[in-house]
Amino acid sequence: GLKEFREGGISIGPDVISNNIGNGSPADGFLDYADTQKWSIIPAIQMMANPSGIVMQEVIEVFYKHFFESFEQHCADIDGIFLVLHGAMVSEGSDDVEGDLFREIHSRLTAKGVNIPVVAVIDFHANVSKDMTDFSTSLYSYRMNPHTDARKAAVEAATLFGILMRGQKASQHHLGTPYVIPPTGLATASDPMKAVLARARAIELQDPDILCINVMGGYSYADIADCGFSLNCCTSGLASVAQGYLDELLIVFEANMSGAYPKEAALKMVLKCIDTEPRGSGPILLVEPADNIGGGTPGDGTGLLSPLLDSGR
């Protein structure tokens, strides 16, 4: 609810800029690049919270109120809309919060006869829907998991945003898949993500028409229709060529798919291994990543606590 977002941070208007400059976030990356380009930024609202459960409708209403008040006031004077999103939000009223937002922005732009690019930087764990791609000009996802490149991805997304604002024509193409991958299978330093991302970067280098290719691992704990691994491409070239690249990347994924579903060790086996190892002088760390520690959560899930207590430890 709003309590968690207030704790995470709600910034409105100019506070969006002052609260992000220099903090190393994606918003900071965008603002820094915008400054180098001498863009005039009209900030609307930023809301943040730790990853958690379904978002209450009151949160969506607050965001819409401030965002679209700013939109209506400045729509006739802006050259584009840039969003910093996660991409896997589920609320009380919608399984596709970001898709709904893009649809509403597109609807209002169309009603006013305004044709400007709408670009968003999104998380590698985004569950990308058809509405997210149909009603945006381009998405741009993080390339690394853990997300050490979040700020860099925002700078690259802002660079693409500038190209589109200068009049570059582009189309966006998406390929959803039935593959729902646990967080433990999404490390970008290991296959299949490593192989898919390497091929995506090679395609971008070899074909100047490809403005970006996004590889999204998806967020498996969201039980929604668009949950899972997906691919996305923004191109200034032929749609058929872009779609062919996405099909090729899916083949690369499927050829390396075994790594996406690692065999997890049972707790009893882990404890047995611990007991048979020579006792060291330091603590033993038992890391349980189920609450998505790679995405910034505190790692304080208690799912293992009961069986550990049952074992007498």
Where is each model-derived feature located?
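Active-site histidine-anchored catalytic micro-motif
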Residues: K3-R6, G53-Y64, H74-R166, P283-L305, ...
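Gly-rich Lys/Arg/Thr-decorated short loops/hinges at beta-loop-alpha junctions or inter-strand turns
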Residues: I10-I12, P43-I54, V84-H86, L249-A255
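Low-complexity, highly charged intrinsically disordered N-terminal segments
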Residues: L31-F71
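Hard-cation-handling environments
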Residues: T184-R313
